Regions:
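Short, glycine-/small- and polar/acidic-enriched structural segments
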Residues: 2, 7-119, 126-133
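Conserved C-terminal helix/tail region of periplasmic/extracytoplasmic solute-binding proteins
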Residues: 198-200, 257-269
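Pocket-lining segment of extracytoplasmic ligand-binding domains
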Residues: 141-228
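Short helix-initiation/N-cap motifs at beta->coil->alpha
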Residues: 23-37, 86, 124-157, 240, ...
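Secondary-structure end/capping motifs
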Residues: 204, 209-259
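Alpha-helix C-terminal capping/helix-coil junction sites
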Residues: 55, 156-160, 249, 253
Length: 269
């Protein structure tokens, strides 16, 4: 069985014991198109928003209730302080860069801007650099694709972008997080939504994989998580992730990216 899975503390034992044929991919998100376009893997790590889009377009996968990566995305939105002050609520009419419109981090950040800062997402000029993982998805009219060779960080420094979503904003220089206190903002988001975290990557299996096999794989994943000390940012189980998943579904649905609000149970059916 071909598999895609990153190297994390919670996956270490699983990768040693599962007997799956793991792809030699150091950064799993670089292979997500191979998951949802080419159907190359029976078992795969996949970003939650990519999974929800894949489901909306009839891709043959079901979710396993295992969070392999998660973080609060409030600290990923950055701006260039050398170009003057800027606040999250001032982004209407501005250019905001992101790797791809539909990726999970960008989707979470747009949700934060809309819900917590009152930003009208249709009035922001989104600037993207890559195609979506799910081929059928179409960026909205207020999104523009940059030609190959353009660099998001360089454009932010040059003033070609007013803000940008960066995987890791630099700790020095003029680039700073646009949300002034990301940790406090994350706590406020938790209180507002009732979710414990913002899911990034979970695990999916093809519909062709039997329930018995997927149950066995999930049990081994749970054993692997236990061996890693049951880290709280890697919750396993449907009930343990119910509110986390509902928050993700709400976020992407409110942006009009999926046709309806799925129930949590549907994701595992």
């Amino acid at each position: 069985m071909k598999a895609l899975l990153g190297d994390y503390p919670v996956t270490k034992l699983f990768k040693q014991k599962s007997g799956l044929e793991f792809a030699d991919v150091k950064v799993p998100n670089t292979a997500f198109k191979r998951v949802v376009r080419d159907f190359e893997f029976e078992f795969a790590e996949l970003a939650i928003m990519t999974y929800l889009l894949a489901r909306a377009h009839g891709k043959p996968f079901r979710l396993l209730p295992a969070v392999v990566t998660a973080r609060f995305q409030h600290g990923t939105l950055a701006y260039n302080t050398a170009r003057g002050p800027l606040s999250p609520g001032q982004l209407a009419g501005r250019k905001v860069g992101m790797r791809s419109y539909s990726v999970t981090t960008a989707t979470w950040v747009r949700g934060i801007l809309a819900e917590d800062y009152g930003v009208d997402l249709s009035k922001v000029h989104w600037v993207t650099f890559e195609d979506p993982h799910v081929a059928e998805f179409r960026d909205p009219p207020n999104a523009t694709r940059m030609p190959p060779g353009k660099d998001i960080a360089a454009m932010l420094l040059a003033g070609e972008l007013d803000a940008a979503i960066l995987a890791q904003p630099p700790k020095d220089g003029p680039i700073r997080t646009l949300i002034p206190d990301p940790a406090a903002a994350a706590e406020a988001w938790k209180k507002r939504t009732g979710a414990g975290l913002q899911i990034n990557h979970m695990v999916v299996v093809k519909d062709s994989v039997s329930r018995r096999t997927s149950d066995e794989l999930y049990a081994l994943l749970a054993e692997s998580r236990k061996a890693a000390g049951n880290p709280p940012m890697n919750p396993f189980g449907i009930e343990e992730n119910r509110r986390n998943l509902e928050a993700a579904i709400d976020c992407i649905h409110q942006q009009g990216m999926i046709p309806r609000r799925y129930t949590v149970e549907e994701l595992f059916a």
